[in-house]
Amino acid sequence: MDKKTTLEMIAAISNANGTSGFEDEVVAAIRPYAEGLGEITEDRMRNLYIRRKENNGKRPVVQLDAHSDEVGFMVQAICPNGTLRIIQLGGWVNHNIPAHKVLVRNRFGEYIPGLTASKPPHFMTEQERKAPLDMKDITVDVGAVSKEEAMEKFGIRIGEPVVPDVTFTYSETTDLMVGKSFDCRLGCAAILKTMHNLAGQELNVDIVGACAAQEEVGVRGATVTAQVIKPDIAIVFEGCPADDTCVEPYMVQTAIKRGPMLRHIDARMITNPRYQRYALDLAEKLGIPVQDAVRSAGATNGAAIHLTEKAVPVIVIGVPVRYAHTHYGISAYADFDNAVKLACEILKRLDEEQIRSF
């Protein structure tokens, strides 16, 4: 898959609207790029499985994982003045939410443009200006003037999803990508590009790609996919939060333009140290730039996959994303490309004996 096609794929998947529990549009965007790779199936949770056509069922199984959902919101109530109360789907910081364009899906599946809003400073007391912003003080304004208009003219009901209204862009000058949902649509794209790059090659493992739903609300999709696939080993792709603009220089472990990040630990998984060392050493040997990190917070689908059956060795190959879990992200294409390169090189070398050594 060449770079032009890869960027078109990333754009299509990034632009698709799909917060947790509402991944249908994302799955539909992924499917065309999975054609020809093998058997494509879905379950009732909207987890998408891509079983490599070269699989023979007699070799160890590698699960390639990424999650398809994005952080977003759900309409909780419609106020008498027509604005919408919302709850978070996934982890947001409240002060990052207001003053952005969003799309509200209505009962007919149409997307209604709106703005995330909070009380303007002109009408705030001094105490309100100094107080932390509470979620109950953030609304979505679609321009309705009453609850009745929001429901009847706009077709909005409670329980509908709300997503950032952002369109993917890429700069040839900087080789940077800007868009929404890079956590983890870059991971979904990495699965597809990895499988395309290995198409037709004889490997010593079977590969199943899984784009899992509902990661942002508790790795729920991966809990299912791991039970279905029953992997012997796994690679989790993630759009991981970059730290190069927000910590002391000596603490930077996830910078853009320095390669993918492999974490030793996060809040819900200690990475298999033997598998982790194998991946880091292989990257060094092949000259693939990588970063390794120790994380005290956050988690990935590895949290569910590594606890499957008798335990599964998992590494996380993360593409750094500045400002993850906001409306926008910035990522370097080279980091994405090197994440795919590392995954391909690992998969070319894995066999039953190597997997047992982990």
Give the residues covered by each predicted segment.
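N-terminal hydrophobic/helix-forming segments and targeting peptides
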Residues: 1-358
